[in-house]
Each structure stands twice: as structure tokens, then as C-alpha cells.
Curated annotation (Swiss-Prot):
Disulfide bonds: none annotated. GO terms for molecular function: ATP binding; ATP hydrolysis activity; ATP-dependent DNA damage sensor activity; damaged DNA binding. Signal peptide: none annotated. It comes from the Archaea. Pfam families: Rad51. Involved in DNA repair and in homologous recombination. Binds and assemble on single-stranded DNA to form a nucleoprotein filament. Hydrolyzes ATP in a ssDNA-dependent manner and promotes DNA strand exchange between homologous DNA molecules. The gene is radA. Belongs to the eukaryotic RecA-like protein family. This is DNA repair and recombination protein RadA. ATP binds at G118, E119, Y120, G121, S122, G123, K124, T125.
Amino acid sequence: MSEEKETIKERSSGFISVRDIPGVGSSIADKLEAAGYLSAWSIVVARAEELAERTGLPVLTVQKIIENARKMLGITFKTAREVKQERSNIGKITTGSKSLDELLGGGVETKTITEFFGEYGSGKTQICHQLSVNVQLTPEKGGLNGRAVYIDTEGTFRWERIEAMARALGLDPDKVMDNIYYMRAYNSDHQIAIVDELFTFVPKNDVRLVILDSVTSHFRAEYPGREHLAERQQKLNSHLHQLMRLAEAYNVAVVVTNQVMARPDVFYGDPTTAVGGHVLAHTPGVRIQLRKSKGNKRIARVVDAPHLPEGEVVFVITEEGIRDSEEE
């Protein structure tokens, strides 16, 4: 590997300030940071129009800054082997179930959006609670030594579950809860604003996991009927891409939950489908469907993931958290 490529790798794996971007002086850096753009990677994944609007800088200036940031970080054509090497920087969070981890290719990945969708009681929120605890574990135990952000749109977050899951892992419940930043989102605009704020909050607080439970509930309630469908989908699409940029810019795992709705045109097989249509179907890197089974058993199935084979596993929800089923 050349000296230039070694430098690129070092830069891409760590935090590089916007002040390190060539051509960015202190006054411009102040404006970028005030708007929530702290790292060079946050500039790379930003849209020029949005960056100009939020900073008050001219579009031409912003375009040059983005171009310089991309050159500095080596954002150019890469060989497949180089892409493979870069994936070694991706972290994975255990779900608490070995079989579910294997289905996910080793756990919930950073730098991507993982969606869990299913009917009420299928285990979506339970998995979110477990991940917010497990991300705090050491890498040897399946964590990332990081903190979690939990955005709750339906009021389903329960600190009692966090305590129980922490104790089951031999962790101090109070310390675990101190490392989970909770925010209740009251409508879709509030939800979008919270995610925008995370571009400043995440790098300052060692956050490695962002949970949004659920991503579609407010959009679905506020934009009912076909007459509002186009507006809803456009707004949801922009929101999902903001989450994707967040995951890629700061190497964090983004987990969203989603509801299901009935499909009246389906007479055989599963008559439900995830809410959000094609917009949500094409954005998350990994889509997992959850279904109820007997008792505390749940079934997880890979619906879409470019790097994972199709398959399904059984796991259980216990008082201690997400665990393997005896059947597996």
C-alpha cells in the first residue's frame, strides 16, 4: 500500500475536524461548526444546497469545501479489495442472541441503517432496548464501548427493561442508563429536527448507536390518505437519507423500527407488508421482519440485505432480554 493510501486510511478511520479541510479558514470553520458540521466526513456526505442554507455560505464556496474534503479523504474510485479493507473499520453490536447475530452477519453493523419491522408485540422495541445496553459492552463481548441515542415516537421506552437487561449482563444499571440519551419525538417535524441535531451531538458524546422507534408512526398519522401520499413520501425519503448520512459520517449504527399494514390483494402467504412503501424499502441496508411464534418465541427473517443470504431464525424474549431459543 502506498504512503498516500496509508494516509487516506488513517484519516477515514478517525475523527478529522472541518478545520483540517484545505481552504477552510477559522471564520468559515466557525460557521460550519455552528451549523453542526464538525467533521470532514459530515461535509463529504452533505448536500451543497443544504449546507449553504444552514451555514449562510455561498453555494460556490460550499461546493469547493465539499470538493476539498472529498480529495483530502480520498473519496474517489477504489478497487473492490480497498472496499473490503475499509469494511474492517465497521463495528458490530450483538443482539444478545447468537442465532440472530449470525442472521445479521455478526450483529448490527455501523455505517448502515438496520430496520426491524413487524406487528405489535413482535419484539421490535425489545431488540432496541437490548441494543442500547449491548453497545456499551467491550468489543470482546459484542459491544462498541459506546453510548446510545434513543428516539421514542410512541412512548414505548421503559427504563425498567434497561435495568433488567443491564443486571443480567453484570453491569451497573445506573451507569448503563447514564449512557443512553433519550428523546421523545412528538411529531414528524420534531423527529426530523432531533436527527438534524445529532450531527453535532453524536461526535461530542461518543455515541455509536442511534435508535428510532418507530420511524414511520408520525408520518403515517400526520399524512393520511392518498392525497397526502406524495408529500409524506418525499419528507420521509429526505429524513431517511439524513439518517444514512449520519451513519456513514460518524461510523454509527442506526436502527429503526417500522410497523406493518395489511395487503388486501394478497390471498396466500403473509398478508402484511412494511409501512413506507418503496421509499423505506430501498433505503435501509438491512431489513429484518419479525413475527410472533409460540409463547416468548419470535421469528426473524432477512427480507433485504445485499451482503446476507436469505434465512430466518428463532429467538426468545426473556426477563433478562434477547436470548437464543433452545430450538436453535
